Amino acid sequence: MASSWFFIVFLVLTVASVRCTTVDHMPSTDEDARDYSKLKTKTEEATDEHHSRTQQAKDELKSKADHAANEVKSNTQQAKDRASEVGKEAKEYTESWTEWAKEKISEGLGFKQDDDPKGSVEKAFDSVADTATKTKDKLQDMASGAGEYSAGKAKDMKDTAYKKTDDVKNAAKGKSSEMRQATTEKARELADSAKENANTAYIAAKEKVRDMADRTSEMTNEAQERGARKAEEAKEVVAEKAEGAAEETKKKNEERGESLKWAKEKAKQGYDAAKSKAEETIESAKDTIASGYESRSRNHKN
């Protein structure tokens, strides 16, 4: 009896083994592990690629931001240098006008810059007075030494000489006063002209500096806006690249997920088919065994 059951079990196993060769091949545990390892490797590669692209986009953004900052710094320094040059030009222009005014005053008065106008006028007055005195003395000598003239004629000549001497002195005083007044007026006119020219030059330089300052501010604002635009563009590029990499990674993961799902379904179908075949084989074996047992029982009775 025990040998009969052993034979039955051996027969069932043999039939099941033969039947299994007719169905689809079932993936083993090692194959599942290899598939999982491949899937994991591809996922890691996709993740590394995503990280690499993200880092590359960050580096590009940093490079563009640094370039924009350097450009803003360069434009600001250029504007500062230009403003300094304008201030220097304005100073030189003002000094040039002042020097020109001094020279014109000296030329208008007829003496050099290092001469004293008041001293020159006094020297001219002293020269005229000295000439008048010498003329008076000479006339007195002529009056006293002219014996052929009468006393009256001599007196008239003396009086005339005195009168002419006084006229010369008065004329010299008047001329000196006129020269002094003319000199003062000329000096005042030249000083006013120099002051006006210097003021004009100062106003022009001030306007030029203001215009340059406005231009500097405008250039700085433009550079800042340009830098902001470039940074925003770089940021958008980074976002687009990151989004594209994420979508690509998601797509690959979905494709791998579908492949793994298909493999699992295929394995399940193979397992179900094998199980069904095995059950059919067992039932058939049971029927065969039962028929053989009944046949032996009938033969034994007979």
Swiss-Prot record:
Residues 25-93, 168-193, 205-302 are annotated as: Disordered. Disulfide bonds: none annotated. One of its GO terms (biological process) is response to water deprivation. Residues 34-70, 79-93, 205-286 have a biased composition (Basic and acidic residues). Belongs to the LEA type 1 family. This is a SET 5a protein. LEA protein are late embryonic proteins abundant in higher plant seed embryos. There are two subsets of LEA proteins (5a and 5b), the first ones are expressed when the cotyledon weight reach 80 mg and the second set are expressed above 100 mg. The function of those proteins is not known. This is Late embryogenesis abundant protein D-29. It comes from Gossypium hirsutum (Upland cotton).
